[in-house]
Amino acid sequence: MKAEKLDFSNENCYCVTLNVIDWVDVFIRPVYKNAIVDALNLFAEKKGLIIYAWCLMSNHLHLVARSQEKHQWPYILRDFKRYTTKEILAELDNEKEPDCRRKWMMQRFESPVNVTRQLAKYHFWQDVNHQEHCPANDPANIMQKIITIHQNPVRALLVDQPEAYILSSARDYKGKRGLVKVELFKILHYKK
């Protein structure tokens, strides 16, 4: 089967899941959760990332987003992964709040020299992203993706309503202020 060629124009959205190496449950401590929230806000404010929806689970991050500038999506995603890797590894090294799982996690994140061609000593995110192109001319599909990612904490039995989960944009869609700057996706603004 031929791989889908992604259209990186700025009109289109992408539904992306970034998974932590070995599915390590990193995002159970506030310091690591805050690193992702801060990075999402930084990239939304300064790097041209337009976020329609997000949801941070214990070992992965879901995003429905696009780039402000044409053809910049792959670079924004790459830079986001690099930046968050650096920030989270720095927090793991933080002596003020030591994590008892530090040694074990660092072993998981260590790059095997014979497998990767990259020079990074550690990898935090899996190299392969689950990334789906969501054409701007199919707003119903985009809205369905947003609803699906907001349901993740409910399916994981963390909350009974999506908007009760603070590490998600579901609360923004219910009129509450969330932790990350999101642009609400309004299906009425798009024509088929």
Provide a role label for each language-model segment:
Residues 1-192:
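Short catalytic/metal-binding and nucleic-acid-binding patches
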